[in-house]
Amino acid sequence: MKLNKPLVITAGEPAGIGPKLCSSLVNTNLLNEIVVIGDASLLDDKLKVIDTPFPAPVKAGCPDPRNAKTLLEGLEIAVKGCLSNKFSGMVTAPIAKNVIADAGISFTGHTEFLANLTNVDFPVMLLVANNLRVALASTHIPLRDVPDFITKERLIKILCVLQEDLKRKFQIKSPEILVCGLNPHAGESGHIGKEDEEIIAPVVKELAKSGMKVRGPISADTAFTAASGHKDAILA
């Protein structure tokens, strides 16, 4: 799809693969203009670049916490450009979260960082590949904390946000959503964990009764197979 304004790409961790990925775009026949935010000395000079030089020397494979602040400033430039309609959208190259944390900066991931910059109280991460759309019920938290994180209130909010965005951003008039179970085989009727039976199933039932086309909990090992039938999105 041809966009009216350029896409902005943040080059990510300077010691990682991001700058090389961005530089490879000069040999690609892109439909839209792109602008890259990063250290110009690490990027192909044919790219249109907003230069954000890093204070510490960059060595491939050896991220330096001294560069973390500049990296995040590049993300802020991209977000402000999108909010001011300078850019049509943004793409983020990989970063090293641990290096940012080592710099003493509170950072759990792009999702939460962008939500904070855009004053979004309840961000929902959606992964999209062609017609496969997967929303996540949790993002950057330890696995041991996930069961306590999956509450009825949270699931209802996520599913309502997902339904609305499928309508508004993907022009799907009446989206159908599958909800994955939390435990193996969606809990086997409560024999492998109680969350699917006590939390997920009641939420699905309540929203389905209100008119939402939602089904679950579905065992995660079968939700992505053709046998599950075509659905517009999966909540996992």
Task: Please name every model-derived segment.
Residues 44, 127-157:
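Ligand-binding beta-strand-loop-alpha-helix segment within the catalytic cores
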Residues 126-127, 169:
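Short secondary-structure boundary/capping segments
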Residues 111-121:
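A glycine-rich helix N-cap at a beta->alpha junction
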Residues 49, 123-125, 134, 234:
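Conserved beta-strand scaffold positions in the cores of enzyme catalytic domains, especially
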Residues 1-110, 149, 153-236:
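Contiguous, glycine/small-aliphatic-enriched amphipathic segments in soluble metabolic enzymes
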